[in-house]
Amino acid sequence: MSSGSIIDRDAISAAFDALDAALDGVAALGFDGLTPRECLALLTHCERLRRRLPAIEHPLINHVARQASPAELGGRLSHAVAEATLISRAEAARRVHTAADLGPRVGLTGEPIAPAPAATAAAQREGLLSPEQVAVIRKFCHQLPGWIDQATRERAETDLAREGTRYRPEQLAALAGTLDDCLNLDGLYRDEDQPAAAG
């Protein structure tokens, strides 16, 4: 084991300890003297921080997926995540699938690969998209028919990621539906697209 690994582990541990300490400090604050407008501004800040957490989880989940076999984990990755974090298996599976899409990936020869929905991943890292908004964009991307070219896919995903910073999830879902109708005017899917189109 190299000393670099120990230093990295120490830095990671210290960063998480600092995050814990910062949250403890904020949780101990009193907010009684604030105006409603100030409280809403702080709630907006809380939401942005909450939205950034998955960007920390994605590389951890993807690393476990690469490094540990189901035998080592005692089952599926989603089950191991559920047991470790005490969340439901359904939520763990959602996080594993989202991490596979939005987290950093590694190619066969070890080279880093950017997330497929790059704009969505970047907006999530900045705390600009909620998990619900991310789910809308991921669903849209997965349901696009195979005949739509990559440049159009990327442009559509970028547009939805940008609009997701301005609209609530249900509004974004309506926009995604309209965009899907524009891209697939006839609603035609090839045979291989049918499972994706069905959801």
Locations of the language-model features?
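Conserved C-terminal region and hinge/linker of Rieske [2Fe-2S] proteins, especially
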Residues: 1-199
